[in-house]
Swiss-Prot record:
GO BP terms, alphabetized: amino acid biosynthetic process; aromatic amino acid family biosynthetic process; chorismate biosynthetic process
Key word Glycoprotein present: no
Protein name in the entry: Shikimate kinase
Gene (UniProt): aroK
Family annotation (InterPro entries): P-loop_NTPase, Shikimate/glucono_kinase, Shikimate_kinase/TSH1, Shikimate_kinase_CS
Keyword Amino-acid biosynthesis among UniProt keywords: yes
Biological classification of the source: Bacteria, Pseudomonadati, Campylobacterota, Epsilonproteobacteria, Campylobacterales
Length: 162
């Protein structure tokens, strides 16, 4: 088995699904945003504000290369922008958690949106969402309809890997 890599726009449920997959498959779960945040000593929002998005993307790119060296399979929850990195290819079996923008925004309360620097301006966030959709689809081994909730997404992933 290869790494199971969850991709999708922020708020699509990647972190929650990763935890459930880890339990179901008895695999360790890794969260790229959390790893970067712990290593840098700042939240993702603080990294964006203090070090800039370019530095965050560099940390992300380097982490992908590092994850490729792991010998055992993991469930990997990724940040929404990770698909901009060419080196994502070959990391593992990739599942795109697809959801429409309006549903994503409804799922995130104000507190959650404040943690996500790219959601400060909803008009710009929607443009980013639309721009990234093609990249998510291009990089996905499988597309998961994430509108049906966590249990439905879990069932879909488990069916694909059965």
């Amino acid at each position: 088995m290869r790494h199971l890599v969850l991709i999708g726009f922020m708020g699509s449920g990647k972190s929650s699904l990763a935890q459930e997959l880890g339990l179901a498959l008895k695999l360790e779960v890794l969260d790229t945003d959390m790893i970067i945040s712990e290593r840098v000593g700042l939240s993702v929002r603080e990294i964006f504000e203090e070090l800039g998005e370019d530095n965050f993307r560099m940390f992300e790119k380097n982490l992908i290369d590092e994850l490729k060296t792991l010998k055992t399979p993991h469930v990997i929850s990724t940040g929404g922008g990770i698909i901009m990195h060419e080196n994502l290819k070959g990391l593992g079996t990739t599942f795109y958690l697809k959801m429409d923008f309006e549903t994503l925004i409804k799922r995130l309360n104000q507190k959650e949106r404040e943690k996500r620097p790219l959601l400060n301006n909803l008009t710009q966030a929607k443009e980013l969402f639309e721009k990234r959709q093609a990249l998510y689809e291009k990089n996905a081994s499988f597309i998961i309809d994430a509108r049906g909730g966590l249990n439905n997404s879990l069932k879909q992933v488990l069916q694909f890997i059965a």
